[in-house]
């Protein structure tokens, strides 16, 4: 009887431990706020948001932004 109680206790401890580990290692999905690459699931933090691939503005988008400001 003592062996069965110990096994159940160990099983419950393992379940509790797994529930504690999962939330601490969760990564952030694409489009959510981030501060560095390690926070994102795709390891790409671009200008405060998780994204893949990291999109850099080209000449066309810079030109459109220039005309929007005028």
Curated annotation (Swiss-Prot):
Expressed by the venom duct. Disulfide bonds join 27-41, 34-46, 40-50, 45-54. Pfam families: Conotoxin_I2. Its main location: secreted. The keyword Signal applies. Contains 4 disulfide bonds. The modification 4-hydroxyproline is found at residue 53. One of its GO terms (cellular component) is extracellular region. It comes from the Eukaryota. The modification Proline amide is found at residue 57. The cysteine framework is XI (C-C-CC-CC-C-C). This is Kappa-conotoxin BtX. It comes from Conus betulinus (Beech cone). The lineage of its organism: Eukaryota, Metazoa, Spiralia, Lophotrochozoa, Mollusca.
